[in-house]
Amino acid sequence: MGKTLVFVNQKGGVGKTTSAINLGAYLALAGKKTLLVDFDPQGNMSSGLGLARGLTVYDLLAGKAHINSVLRTTPVHNLFAIPASIDLSGATVELVDEQDRELYLKKILAEVKDTYDFILIDCPPSLGILTLNGLAAANEVFIPLQCEYFALEGLTLLLQTVKRVQSGLNTALSIGGIFFTMYDTRTKLAQEVVKQVTTYFGDKVFNTIIPRNVKLSEAPSHGLPISSYDAQCAGARSYEKLAREIVARDGQR
């Protein structure tokens, strides 16, 4: 059975979508059949993969399409995607009065979960109904953390939400890991944040740190993961290393 990882942080601009795209690409390149699920109405994952307009995850939630008709190929062999569009924002209203409204995505992905080694869900930067769907559908939570003071405050709130989900919606949910993004070696604050979080969370923190890197910012505008855009840059090497770390940890569980 495949493993579903959800990428969550209620703060925007922390590298969540960039991380989901690039880790998905490197997992696929490592021979792991991988599915990326864009569950953010902004659709940044979809545009970052150069996906054309068409059926989206909203059509699945609305019961207008079957998952096989929404699946897309990507520029990377073994990497597939379910795109999103702004229509998904309507689901937050439409699901409010529905029974089991937090379990819609879980039911959709159940049809294909055994087909993939990894499913990666990119949630919006909020803790609303869409993110709850992502948490309910996942085996593990992955938290990208930018190296700044406010990131620590947000982490506390996020972990409280995860605990609430663990106590009801998804008792099997666990913290897959925390990893640092946009790391700038020149700032003392970045070093201090890494030290504090690592001291508190121990082995939940991945060893690999993603540096601040121009190429990582450029790649989405070309509709490519960093592995296809510039595999030799520091950002690419870091995501490849982090993907290997994820696979290694998965093998130990």
From Swiss-Prot:
Q: Where does ATP bind?
A: 11-18, 211, 213
Q: By its UniProt entry, which CDD domains does this protein fall under?
A: ParAB_family
Give yes or no: UniProt keyword Repeat.
no
Q: Name one GO molecular function term.
A: ATP binding
Which InterPro entries does the record associate with it?
A: AAA_dom, DNA_Partitioning_ATPase, P-loop_NTPase
TM ranges are none
Assigned EC number: 3.6.4.-
Catalytic activity of the protein: ATP + H2O = ADP + phosphate + H(+)
The positions annotated for binding Mg(2+) are: 17
Describe its function. ATPase probably involved in chromosome partitioning. Cooperatively binds dsDNA, forming nucleoprotein filaments in a strictly ATP-dependent fashion.
Membership in a protein family = Belongs to the ParA family.
Protein's name in the database: Chromosome-partitioning ATPase Soj
Q: Where does this protein come from, organism-wise?
A: Treponema pallidum (strain Nichols)
